[in-house]
Design a protein with these regions (language model features):
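Aromatic-rich, lipid-facing transmembrane alpha helices and their immediate juxtamembrane interface loops
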Residues: 1-240
C-alpha cells in the first residue's frame, strides 16, 4: 500500500498520458505525434527521477528491449504498422510507462489470479482460431503460458496480458496502428488486434525481469520476486 501511495500520482499520469496521447496522435495530424512524444519522454524522465537506483536498471532495460522489439515486429516482420509507417518516438517510453503501471497493478492482485486470466482467455483464443479469424492466437497464447511457466512473476504477466490488450483495442480502434490480417512468414491470420497480443508484452517483461532480477526484488517493481525473496529470508531467519 505504501508503494501504491508513493506512486499513485504517477500511475494516474501514466494512464492519462497513454489514453490522451493516442487520442492526440490520431486527431492532431500535423503536430500531434511530436507533442505526444515530448510528453511521453517528459513523463518517463519524471518516473526515472522518482525511481530509486534499484528500479532504474529495469526501466532502462525495458526501454532498450522495447525499442528493439518494436523495430523487429513493425519494420522487419511487419505484423503491424503505425499510421505514418514509422515507429513514433512516444512508443519506447510508452512501453516503460505501461510496464511500470503493470507492476503497480500486479502488486494488488490475489494469488493465482494469473490462472484465472489464462482460463478466461483460452476459449476466446480457441474460438477465433477455430473460425479462422485469428490463427496466430494459439501461438501467442502458448507464448503467454510459457512466460507463466518460466518465471515466478506470473501476476505481472497476467496483468500485462490484460492491460496491453486494453491498450491494443484502444489504439487500433482510434487508428494509431493496425495489425495485418495475414501474418508474414507464418501464413497465419490475425484479428486487429490479436486477442493474445499481450504475449509480446509478457515476453518483454520476462526479459526485463530476467536481466534485472536482483534489482527487481523491490516490491514496487516485481511483487512475485519480492514475495519469493521475503519468504526465503524469513525461512532462513527461522532456522537460526
Amino acid at each position: 500500500m505504501r508503494i501504491m501511495g508513493e506512486f499513485g500520482t504517477m500511475n494516474a499520469l501514466i494512464i492519462a498520458t497513454v489514453a490522451g496521447g493516442l487520442l492526440i496522435d490520431q486527431h492532431w495530424a500535423l503536430y500531434g505525434q511530436v507533442a505526444v512524444s515530448a510528453l511521453a519522454w517528459i513523463v518517463f524522465a519524471a518516473l526515472w527521477m522518482r525511481s530509486g537506483r534499484e528500479r532504474r536498471p529495469a526501466l532502462a532495460a525495458c526501454l532498450l528491449i522495447a525499442t528493439a522489439g518494436e523495430a523487429f515486429l513493425s519494420l522487419v516482420w511487419g505484423v503491424y504498422a503505425y499510421r505514418l509507417g514509422n515507429i513514433p518516438l512516444f512508443v519506447p517510453p510508452g512501453h516503460v510507462l505501461l510496464f511500470f503501471l503493470g507492476t503497480q497493478i500486479a502488486e494488488r492482485l490475489p494469488a493465482r489470479s494469473e490462472w484465472v486470466v489464462a482460463a478466461l482467455a483460452l476459449p476466446l483464443v480457441g474460438l477465433l482460431a477455430w473460425n479462422g479469424r485469428d490463427t496466430l492466437g494459439p501461438l501467442l497464447y502458448a507464448l503467454f503460458l510459457a512466460c507463466l511457466w518460466l518465471s515466478p512473476s506470473r501476476r505481472l504477466y497476467a496483468t500485462m496480458f490484460v492491460l496491453s490488450l486494453a491498450m491494443e483495442l484502444y489504439g487500433t480502434w482510434l487508428g494509431n496502428w493496425v495489425w495485418v490480417p495475414q501474418v508474414p512468414w507464418l501464413g497465419l491470420t490475425a484479428t486487429n488486434p490479436p486477442l493474445a497480443a499481450g504475449a509480446f508484452y509478457c515476453v518483454l517483461d520476462l526479459l526485463v525481469v530476467s536481466l534485472t532480477a536482483r534489482q527487481l526484488a523491490s516490491p514496487g517493481l516485481n511483487p512475485s520476486v519480492a514475495s519469493h525473496h521475503a519468504a526465503t529470508c524469513k525461512a532462513r531467519s527461522s532456522l537460526r
